[in-house]
Amino acid sequence: MSYNESSQIKYWMFNNEGLKKLREQCNNQHKQVILEKTPSSEPNILSPDDELSLIHYYETKTLEIAMALNLPDKVSAPAIIYIKRFYLKNSIMQYGAKLVMLSCLFIACKTEDNHLDIDYYSNITKASPSDITNLEIIILESLNFNLIVYHPFRPMYGYILDINDNSAIYNNTNGVSPIKFDTLWETCKKSIQKSLFSDCCFEFHPQIIALACLNLNWDGFNMYCINNNNNNNNNNNNNNNNNNNNNNNNNNNNNNNNNNNNNNNNNNNNNNNNNNNNNNNNNLLL
């Protein structure tokens, strides 16, 4: 399935106002539950901003745990985005962020086929296996079972590979720093990780986020865009020329066919006339 047909673009893209509205709705719904159950006139209730601050804290902890366990970016990125999506439909006052974080990271490991032993994971994170797994169904239902996440790491890797393959163009340009694949990748990766702690994943497509991070970290970005634009224009011109050539060939073939048909028709008419003349001559002889 392509990104344009994915559940991410269909169900998980919002603007600022939409995100704010969803978070306020979740907060208000659980606030009413607390007020009904708490006799105190002034119960401790978190505001939407308070909840967002706590969620942000546990998103950063997710990355720390993933790095401690040597989990790849393809696991940590979906885990963080699962947490974000979960708390668009649920309040942190209803489901504690620590266990949600641990469950989301464990789900991401399974989704990305990166095996993680539950007992080992439980021992490292100081949470019981049942605490980690009990929330799985609740989280999956809140995510609508939309587990495939398109994150900026993949397009970024592709961009840097393309830059590296054409490094001779950029390395010989004044004002552009020499390209070292590993250095540029690690620098851009840190920017992507920071973007995961914001709402970028809800508001922008992953390839756009990747380009923005590349622009922040590489002074040859503008030249890269111009070069790609020129290549695209050349490809379009070549395609147009090929189409024109094909059209000309088709027209020539059609003209040749029409000429052949006309010649055949003329020959047939001549043959018919000759036959008629012969018949007339025969009639005269009779």
Curated annotation (Swiss-Prot):
Residues 79-148 form the Cyclin N-terminal domain. Keywords: Cell cycle, Cyclin, Nucleus, Transcription, Transcription regulation. One of its GO terms (cellular component) is nucleus. Its main location: nucleus. InterPro entries: Cyclin-like_dom, Cyclin-like_sf, Cyclin/Ssn8, Cyclin_C_2, Cyclin_N. Disulfide bonds: none annotated. Pfam families: Cyclin_C_2, Cyclin_N. Transmembrane segments: none annotated. Residues 235-286 are annotated as: Disordered. GO terms for biological process: regulation of transcription by RNA polymerase II; transcription initiation at RNA polymerase II promoter. GO terms for molecular function: cyclin-dependent protein serine/threonine kinase regulator activity. It is found in: Nucleus. May regulate cdk7 involved in transcription regulation and cell cycle progression. Belongs to the cyclin family. Cyclin C subfamily. This is Putative cyclin-H. The lineage of its organism: Eukaryota, Amoebozoa, Evosea, Eumycetozoa, Dictyostelia.
